[in-house]
Amino acid sequence: MKTIKLSKHDKYVLELKNKIKDNYDSISLNVPVKYSKRSLGEIDLIAKKGNRFDLYEVKCSYRILKAKKQLDRIKKYLNLKNARSYFYCGNSKLLVVV
């Protein structure tokens, strides 16, 4: 049986999921976001607890400005103004509120 080799980014996404999984009712990974026929991108991790959504963007290196821009754009199009946004740097294992 052939094993699938995960990318560094995918390993970091799974690492973050394992860190936060006990705090949420459900977690979705690599969620594509589309508007009409146009792709707006992908959210690395969406976590739900009750009626509250938290969005997580994972980067291999510390590129917080790019992550914030992506999260803000997704929140705008999904009308999730009250959702909390987080950035996770896999290299430094740092989780930051953005």
Predicted regions and their residues:
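Intrinsically disordered, low-complexity Ser/Thr/Pro/Gly-rich regulatory segments
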Residues: 1-98
